[in-house]
Each structure stands twice: as structure tokens, then as C-alpha cells.
């Protein structure tokens, strides 16, 4: 014999909190499509591209320029360590400036990805209101409007 469920046909997702724990601003449909794999891919691309396209070239160029300035006599070499401290500092500064100069490119990648997911629960405003019109959202919006329209007894 087949066992019969006493709970009926509930189609609750296992990853959604119960209705009593959800806020009025929660939209169940928007939580279903968080593309963590694609976000991780964009982060990895940004790290690799910023290193190879900006940080490494800036670092090498600044180190070569600094070594040239020390060799020409425009910068004094350290008596104990030679040109190493100045070249190392120039390399670190070039690396940092190269990474920082690539920030706008990464931001544009995230903005283009956000435009693809508009209304799917991505970005800083995804929890503020429900952009999708699901039945749960409609009933909650109706309940909150009724509760807010009752006059106080004061």
C-alpha cells in the first residue's frame, strides 16, 4: 500500500524560511535565482585580468624606471642595500596602482551582470521590495496595507 501524506500537497521549498519568520519585504521568487557561480566567475576574471593587464605591467615599468633613475644618479642608492629598497617600493606602488586602476572595469562587469538579472534578487535593493508579482507578495501587501490603515485608539 502507498502511504498517504497527512500534510496535503504543500509545495514549499526547503530553502525558504517559514511564513512566520519571513519579513513583509521578502519575495520568495527573488530568492530562487542567486547566481553565485557567475558572480564567482566575474570575481576570478577581475582578479586575473587586473593582475596581468594592469598590476604586473605597472609594477615592472615602475621598477625599471626607478632602477634607471638610480643608475643615472637622480636617486641615491642605499650604501648597504643598493637600489633594492627603492626598486621594491616602486614595484609595490606600481602593483597597488595597477590593481586600483582596474576597479572601474570590474564595476562595469558587475553592472552589466546586474542589468541581466534586474528583478531577480541581485544588488543592494533586492530585499527592499518585491519586484515580482507572486501570490504570496500580493497577499502580504494586502495584509500590511490593512494593518497600516487601521486608526489608533489614542
Curated annotation (Swiss-Prot):
Subcellular location: Endosome; Mitochondrion; Mitochondrion inner membrane
Keyword check for Transferase: no
N6-acetyllysine, modified sites: 41
GO biological process, alphabetically ordered: response to bacterium
Keyword Iron-sulfur applies: no
GO cellular component, one term: mitochondrial inner membrane
Tissue-level expression: Abundant in kidney, liver and brain.
Alphabetical list of Pfam families matching this protein: OCIA
Domain OCIA intervals: 1-120
Disulphide bonds in the chain: none
InterPro entries: OCAD1/2 (IPR040187), OCIA_dom (IPR009764)
Keyword field: Acetylation, Endosome, Membrane, Mitochondrion, Mitochondrion inner membrane
Oligomer status and interactors: Interacts (via OCIA domain) with OCIAD1/ASRIJ and STAT3.
Function of the molecule: Has an essential role in the assembly of mitochondrial respiratory chain complex III. Is also required for STAT3 activation and plays a role in cell migration.
Protein name, UniProt field: OCIA domain-containing protein 2
Annotated gene: Ociad2
